[in-house]
Amino acid sequence: MKSAVLAALSALNSCPMQPNITVRLQRELFDAAAEAAQLTRGRSDVGALVQFTGICRGAEEGEPIAALTLEHYPGMAEAEIERHVGEALARWPLMGVTVIHRYGRLSPGEPIVLVIAASSHRAAAFAAAEFLMDYLKTRAPFWKQVETANAANWVDAKATDDAAAERWRERDDAAE
């Protein structure tokens, strides 16, 4: 379901057809190929599709991971992700965006997040997908707990993730 803000931003996007937008939080596994097919179905204007799938690693700092638990603030998380999808639509000429983020207890090797950006050209698709992942890693209202054989610890955002997200703000400042 598309929020009113996202619908308004979609209308301002420079693409002639309305962008296909999917934002979903779920416990279940997702099918990345099926999601990509759904995003581009009926669109002959898509020339580039960039897809990122984040996967639960089997080790953190050399220690084996038993599980990863992701929690979120229902309603707020979807609204915040939609807001950033809207920002991506305002920045780049996108034909569509899919963001699916899982929550609950995940095992190593399972997919966590899917971001797909569709555009007529690769530069916009790559930039939008990277922008959205940088946001999801640093600002989305998710909490991550890593469970090892010895402990379960809540994880903070990494400085490298914060630096990656900061470059988008620096680009905005330079453009003004």
Task: Write out the residue ranges for each language-model feature.
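Intrinsic disorder/low-complexity segments
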Residues: M1-P16
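N-terminal, polar/charged subdomain of small-to-medium soluble alpha/beta proteins
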Residues: C15-I112, F126-E130, D134-E176
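Short glycine-rich or small-residue beta-strand-to-loop segments that form or flank ligand, phosphate
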Residues: I112-S119
